């Protein structure tokens, strides 16, 4: 049984309320302080580096306007939904599937919708401060059960909310949402187990699932580990009734929170990054020894900047969120607790998590067997480590000094990375150290050692003091604040040479949006900041985001264009610009000479406008056109990858089953025409496609409308990513959609004038809406029943 576990009802209600808000306030205030210098420096438009700059600011601002109906108009087609399809997301993507991983289910995002769109870039820091505060509040609620003095729960809340994981993941922003909400889920589980509360666990299951379905997979795994470890340690007695209660609330919570789940699952099943079942030894061992060292030290040392490694030259380290560091204390308190307990559930939980971290297939189970390595579940064991730390600090019988010395020696041992002799095989010369970033290494090591020394010193002089918890909390807050400033500063100023003009380009793009020529077309950019197309509300070939339409992930690789977390086809792939209806290219005046040297013919300089340089694509083809020829998939796959964009301007690629049904409307491309693929023939192909293109093409927030007049029945091609959520109508009649060109779309239209409408609604959304709509009133009735029963039995209001 947990040594300090006590019933919640024994805690004075007023005191708990006060301490809860104290935890919230301290964590939020500390976050506000360490963000403040950067907030002032940036004039309120805080920008950091990498994903935060390119995705988080941009996505929050863009989606704030999108959900309010800004941008493209509603579809005029009868019964079409509103705000379901985003043209500014890559080549166009369903908004729910593209953003449910980032923000679409986040309560923090929906809170930000109350603000004007123009405020969002300036509100990123206040929102982050709120998230840190919410994380502290949730951690306090969880931890107070396991301490005698609630001041230690406040201390543990600060350790968790300001942990290395939380500070590191400011870089990704939406990961902090998960850090903030998870403790409430664990607290609610404890309340159901120990206090027999009804409805609370189901509610927080729903909130966490809705917030981020991807992280929820890891939370389910962790809760199973947590439950089994507590059960085997005899922390509670499981009865059939209690198990049924937990199972029912788990199912009910998933049902309430599954609004985004069904569409997300259907989309993920088409995503090649999700799972790789052919790994073999890769299931059991990491390929590089350095990966193991990095994992072990990530629980002890403060984290590196997300995109900079101090030591490691091999393994997957950058951007992985690999840190479980607790500020000031590191693992010293947790190890002290470990040594003082036997058959303890917290020890078992941490031990299982450590094994999972070291076995690839177990590690990947926390994020849906994603084929890429990440450690983005470490926030969960971090909460348990915080609990172990405060338990050790509160117990006067626990030896705190010896574990701290041991952790200190491990930190000092990392100095070997700086002094180990290295021989250059090429020159034969010798040098010392294998450090990749010596300055950052010594800063990180210095903070780690300084924290441990302060920890030992403060424990030595204050442990017998009645205000020990408050003083340690103050020390943790000061240490976390200073380290967070340094950590963010390293990441921010490490890319200052590339990001210093970010705000200027983003704000200039808002002006350019009003000055671009009217019409619905795509754009391209050259060597400017990521996702500028979203500030212009235009579909852009250069896009940085992980969860665009899955068919994009098959279309681009088929052309030899890499597509992992971003789309960035090289400018030398000129034929792709005609195929995808790119009419304008945007760069900066400083990059004009470089662009003209690198690009092929076919671009005409127009003007310098709003800080940008604008070019027109001479080979622009309006969206929606027909072909005279087709090629089979086998022929396409046998062609030269680098010339496939040219081939796609000449012929449509049909799947084998579609050749039988639709090949009659086209002629199979003769072999002689498979080789004549160069720039001059491309310009003629563009002219041919342009001559048989749609007279009207209108983008809307649920898809698009087009009009075309054909001499004979033919397939009309649209360079829009194929998605099961689309329904096509030709002259008002529902029509089959063909998947062509390994990821794009076409429909069959009759001779004469045709009116074409593509209407998007995320596949699976109808079913998820029904489940959620049924589950919510069931939950309300369920909670009301137990509230009523409690009141009847006690004769007083009850908190259920």
Residue ranges and their predicted role:
Residues 97-101, 479-499, 512-582, 620-685, ...:
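Extracytoplasmic/lumenal acceptor-recognition loop(s) of multi-pass membrane glycoenzymes
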Residues 27, 128, 132-145, 151-232, ...:
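Membrane-embedded helix bundles of polyisoprenyl
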Residues 196, 215, 346-505, 751-800:
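Contiguous transmembrane helix-bundle modules in multi-pass membrane proteins
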